[in-house]
Amino acid sequence: HQLRNAAVALTTIDVLRQRGWHIDESAVRQGLAQAAWPGRFQVVRRQPTIILDGGHNPQCMVSLAAAIREYLPGQPVTVLTGVLADKDYGKMYDQLAPLAARFITVTPHNPRALDAGELAAFLRRYGKPVTACDTIREGVSRMLADTPPDGTAVCCGSLYLLGDVVQSLEKV
């Protein structure tokens, strides 16, 4: 996503320059260097490495899976996840399952959320260990217990999940 967004920004700058706007090259470089999209492959902790990604549809999971393959090649990844029931979660997890060592499911705080137990039952089809947790805090504790200090965990599936994960990480 970030590369596509940068390409759109650069194209916009080119169009504005063609229309007479003066946009300093150093400002463009600084803007690109400082650009960040919280909740998109965002590293929030080390030992173990914890990555947040708010991807909540199949296209976002394609991007997340590509980032995992690029930046964590061959590494087993613990996946803490929760999803809204009205999302196409079958196609979402088809992208992620080949890269997951294990899944930990939680229920996001949203009336449309899929129950962690239902999601766990669905994810078992991929043949990976799956643990359903009653609370997000319990899921974060389980994720930290299941991920070695030199390992990586990815928290994904819903933007509604990420804030609660960050709060739970601060408390454990």
Q: Where in this protein do the model-derived segments appear?
A:
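Nucleotide phosphate-binding/pyrophosphate-handling subdomain across enzymes
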Residues: H1-R102
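C-terminal helical cap/extension that packs against the catalytic core
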Residues: T49-I51, P58, Y93-T152
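Glycine-rich, phosphate-binding/catalytic loops in enzymes
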Residues: A67-I68, F122, K171-V172
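Active-site-proximal loop/hinge segments that shape catalytic or ion-binding/gating pockets
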Residues: S158
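Short, active-site-adjacent cap segments at secondary-structure transitions
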Residues: L161-G163
